[in-house]
Amino acid sequence: MAKISCSYFLVLMLVFSVFSLVEKTKGKRHCSTIILPESPCVPQDCVEYCFEEYNGGGTCIASKTGRTTNCMCTYNCHGNNL
């Protein structure tokens, strides 16, 4: 009987922890934009510009193999007045 109660308790804890994680992420939407698509991406500049302008994270990505990289900025849509 004690083993069953312990199992139920652990399952209950797991369910509550999942619900708490879902509630934390609910309502947070991330947007992304390409910054200066006509110029090649410089990683340090991309990170700094994205943080200063959008309070987000910038990464250099290539749209297709062999093409120059562009700066993609991912940020919280609700945290900016854009």
Curated annotation (Swiss-Prot):
GO terms for biological process: defense response to fungus; killing of cells of another organism. InterPro entries: DEFL (IPR010851). Keywords: Antimicrobial, Disulfide bond, Fungicide, Plant defense, Secreted, Signal. The gene is LCR21. Belongs to the DEFL family. One of its GO terms (cellular component) is extracellular region. It comes from the Eukaryota. It is found in: Secreted. It comes from Arabidopsis thaliana (Mouse-ear cress). This is Defensin-like protein 156. It holds the Pfam family SLR1-BP.
